[in-house]
Amino acid sequence: MKIARHKVNRLSRLTRIFFGGLVIFLVFWSGWAQQPPSSPLGPLSARTGLLLKDSVIIRLIQASSGDLAFDTVSHLALWHRLQTSESYTRAAEWISQKARDIGLEQVGIERFPADGTIEYFGNTMPPQWKVMKAELWLTSPFSMKLTSYAELPLSLAMHSTSADVEAELVDIGAGIDDKDYTASVKGKIVLTTSNALRIYDRAVAKEGAAGIVSSWSVPDFDSLNRRPADFPDQVGWQRIPGKGVEGPSHFAFGLSARRAQELQSLIRQGKTVRVHAIVEAKLVPGNLEVVSGTIPGSAYPNEEIVVTAHLDHYKPGANDNASGSASILEMARTMRQLIENKEMPPPLRTIRFMWVPEYNGTYAWLSKHLNDPVKRLADLNFDMVGENVVKTNSVISVCYTSDSNPSFLNAVMESILDFVNRFNDDRYPAQTDFYIGSLNGTRNRAAWRMIPFVSGTDHDLFNRLRIGAASLGAWPDDFYHSSEDSPDKVDPTQLHRAVVLGLAAIDTLAYADSEQAQDFAQLSLVYGRQRIAHSEFSASRSLLSATKNGFHEADHLAGNLMAHVFSRERAAISSAVMLARTPKARSDVQRVVSWLDGDEAASRKKVEDIARLRAGELGLTRSPLPLTEADKRAARLIPIWNEGKELFSFEYVQRILAQDSSAQIPKIKAALDEVSQRLRDRGVDELTLYGFQDAAALYVDGKRSIPDIRDALAAEYTSIAVEALELYFRAFEKAGLMKILDK
């Protein structure tokens, strides 16, 4: 019995030890299991070139879907999503419900009045255009329905209002020259190949035409990429004037080139062609509606990464811009899923997703939120991102921030773009873990590129506020702003790649903490050196090609360019300081900035050597360009924005001062047009030139003098006379937007 009791006691002790150890193990295991996932960021990856860990980018690829995004595109393409319209409201409500369903927080639709007179930052907001019915019929020499709003909403020009007119159809060709109106068009409906808006004042307001039928579909700025004959069944998206909710009845219809040619043939045969236009539509007060939702930041909730896409446009508007709207919804869904499944921690910063009416909605939203107690670190914009590039003749690109707003964001975006290209440039890549495709998509190769800053979409406004802002988009697109911008031109694979780029950028920015500030600075240094090398090449080439008469200017501009790009890249690296929260982290960033000092000395020496070589070949002595009296006067002048006016544009200045001859607006416009033409002659594309008239204003920071701004423009674009710039800024001052300090 004693032995038995001893064995029992021993077993009891062993049991207690076992279960005690098990409890301790379970406690530790439970604690380990409940640890939140680690930061997605790490040191620069040798495989991917990203600041994201390899395992994270793989998970982002696998968790996201281009096919789900494509389904969203197909749904949005069912609505004629014009700004302030009832169909836009339905699309906004649908998106907001989807945002709630996937778990975004603070989801809501903000409404801003718009009636054709209300302005935000000097931009007049359009009224609601309410269409009940619109049809265009051929009534002679036979009866046939030519088009209808119900079947093709885009065929009725925006802002057309109620009319019931049966009249003779007369062909006026382009409708621009006097010869097009040798025969009276009063009371008749004119057939034209021009944009209805372009000829409206002449044909309707002056000559008395009852209405317009237009076969136009190719914007002037896209004429290098397509011609009307290339797509004979394409109907272009058009509008006519419609400033307020009251005014005379007027209308315009759009037809395809093929249908218009049929009508022209009847007219040439000498037959009397009559058409019947029936329009029930009116302009009424409406609202701009902005949908937004957030993933709140866990550590720095008052710092935001803003992700934007414009929700509006014509039906179908698949690539422009159901694709961008669908892409950011898929980014939000993927982020919420990974956080909810504890595969990723909550972001340190708040991520705000916004679906907006392009430009106007962002202007309106900023009018309310510009002074919110939050720090907006970046805007990532997605506009026309789903193109099947083979079908649409497109190139996918990411634009740098403007040189007036240098940012580490450029290096972040370029590193992700390089990653996408590297692992998606073959149809059947060897490294499939980094391949981004879709079940129902193509195997088109990725050949994305970085391009100079362009405006034309919503990132432009954040850039003006000196927030790092980049935009992903496709250009050209053969179906842009036409009836053929349909879901069959959208590629789920391309959507998936856009989503992954967005997720990678969002995560890199939203999870960065103070200890990563130096990593961002170093990444900016690497990519900045690449851009500097390109500028060094450009400066050297311009010197070697300089003629005797043009050498001194080329020498000056080459030196100016090198000074500019080093200043830009120092500022881009320095911008990483916004992530630094300790003196050491800030010091680490500035140490990286200093590494450019040696680079600049070496780079300038190489350019100087080439300048001396070329001067010798031409038999010239190098000398600086002499300062003119205008230079000396302007050097004392420093433009400063008046508070809250930074988003006002030169277009507003022109409108406000149109009747003020002392502002010399025609002279300023002529100077800007001359510079734009020189850039075109150099092969600069229209997308880059879009918004150029505001480029000088972007450099206004209260520190730069007018010659400083001239020099910056010369480096980023081309030279402009300092006298023209002084007039330009005087006009801004006269319009109440700036003041000019005379130091």
Could you say what each language-model-derived stretch is?
Residues 688-743:
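Long, charge-rich, low-complexity alpha-helical segments
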Residues 35-52, 62, 66, 74-186:
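Noncatalytic luminal/extracellular "stalk/propeptide" segments of secretory-pathway proteins
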Residues 74, 84-86, 147-244, 249-251, ...:
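Extracellular/luminal Protease-associated
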Residues 19-29:
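Bacterial N-terminal signal peptides
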Residues 239-242, 252-253, 260-261, 300, ...:
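Metal-dependent peptidase/peptidase-like ectodomains
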Residues 71, 334-364, 372, 382:
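Short helix-loop-beta-strand segments that form the rim/entrance of peptidase-like active sites
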Residues 148-180, 237-320, 330-346, 350:
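Soluble metallo-hydrolase cores and metallopeptidase-like ectodomains found primarily
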Residues 56-63, 77-87, 171, 189-195, ...:
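Second-shell loop/turn segments in exported
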